[in-house]
């Protein structure tokens, strides 16, 4: 049994990482490693009571027990009147291709833990200024297995709809029953995490409308929400501007080469909808880099993440349902199934300060309803 919250002292870590001596890609890897090691040693306990959260899973086994502190990256000290429930992206990557590797990461899988803890700093931290950020660990599908399922079926639904969704559902039950205390909330994720957020929106909140009505917004970033999704699940609404509430906010970021070649991108699905994270429009109105309040990028010389200007403009490309940018950044997503110039890994960081401001704006709009 745990008390809400378990705090991981990650606020501000990105501003005080030690300087690293390596150059190039090795330095990038060291930055992520440093982020992870900082988070690993930062656990401490604070206050809120809870009961056991072990539940029978939809797939027939036992979901993860979220009454155990080891099941959470963070249950924060409550200092805000709005929460964020964040689901991290695929971190079980390289080791998932090893011979005999399981399809799903165990909760103590070192590669997954490091990736999740690093992603807290680069992505989930954007919600810290306005909300209490909750982040569960979950048994996620490995990159190898997700790729195999996608090859067979055309999507990764079968990979995430069992074990992974069972864990997220159990984590949500624990959160709402023991830690939320009736506060409004945001749910957010990236990549595989966002695909799970979609499952939550489509299924969990349909089963729990009393919880859904307190949702400020859902940030389904780095995975597609499509027109078909909205037709099939009429209780879902996509954002139409910068301050509507109870809505889905989503985009996938690409460079001009992906668009020019009409390249296949695993997260850009047919019928996808993206909102422009600079001007918050759904049409193809161009937003110049001058509207970008700051990107959150690694400084390879200093060995830390910092707010900077990389010329990250944004424009919706309606025929692909993505955002295209001319950002001055030479590190597109490595996996070939994202296309030659996808900025999948930078969906949050390119538009970090605009997203932070948008979170505050939607919360203010929710309060004034």
Regions found by a protein language model. Name each.
Residues 166-181, 203-352, 356-365, 369:
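Surface cap/lid and interfacial helix-loop subdomains adjacent to catalytic sites
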Residues 3-27:
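Short, Lys/Arg-enriched N-terminal segments with co-localized hydrophobic residues
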Residues 27-35:
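Bacterial N-terminal signal peptides that target proteins for export
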Residues 196-200:
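Hydrolases whose catalytic domains are alpha/beta-hydrolase-1, hotdog thioesterase
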Residues 88-183, 327-369:
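Active-site catalytic motif of lipid deacylating hydrolases and related acyltransferases
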């Amino acid at each position: 049994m745990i008390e809400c919250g378990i705090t991981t002292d990650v606020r501000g870590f990105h501003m005080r990482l030690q300087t690293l001596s390596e150059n190039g890609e090795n330095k990038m890897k060291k930055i992520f490693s440093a982020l992870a090691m900082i988070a690993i040693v930062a656990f401490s306990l604070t206050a809120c009571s809870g009961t056991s959260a072990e539940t029978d899973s939809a797939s027939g086994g036992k979901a993860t027990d979220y009454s155990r502190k080891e099941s959470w990256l963070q249950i924060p000290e409550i200092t805000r009147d709005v929460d964020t429930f964040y689901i991290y992206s695929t971190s079980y990557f390289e080791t998932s291709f090893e011979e005999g590797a399981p399809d799903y990461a165990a909760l103590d899988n070192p590669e997954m833990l490091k990736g999740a803890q690093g992603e807290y700093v680069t992505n989930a931290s954007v919600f810290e200024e306005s909300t209490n950020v909750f982040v569960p660990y979950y048994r996620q599908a490995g990159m190898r297995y997700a790729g195999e399922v996608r090859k067979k079926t055309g999507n990764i639904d079968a990979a995430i709809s069992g074990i992974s969704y069972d864990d997220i559902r159990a984590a949500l039950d624990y959160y709402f029953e023991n830690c939320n205390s009736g506060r409004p909330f945001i749910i957010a994720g990236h990549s595989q995490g966002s695909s799970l957020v979609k499952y939550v929106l489509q299924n969990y909140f349909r089963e729990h409308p009393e919880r859904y009505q307190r949702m400020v917004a859902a940030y389904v970033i780095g995975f597609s929400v499509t027109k078909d999704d909205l037709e099939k699940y009429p209780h879902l609404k996509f954002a139409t501007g910068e301050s509507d509430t109870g809505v889905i906010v989503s985009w996938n970021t690409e460079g001009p080469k992906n668009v020019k070649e009409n390249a296949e991108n695993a997260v850009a699905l047919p019928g996808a909808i993206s909102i422009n994270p600079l001007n918050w429009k759904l049409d193809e109105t161009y937003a110049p880099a001058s509207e970008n309040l700051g990107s959150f990028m690694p400084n390879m010389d200093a060995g830390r993440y910092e707010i900077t200007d990389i010329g990250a403009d944004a424009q919706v490309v309606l025929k692909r349902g993505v955002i295209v940018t001319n950002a001055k950044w030479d590190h597109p997503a490595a996996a070939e199934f994202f296309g030659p110039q996808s900025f999948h890994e930078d969906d949050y960081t390119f538009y970090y300060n605009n997203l932070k401001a948008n979170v505050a704006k939607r919360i203010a709009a929710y309060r004034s309803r």
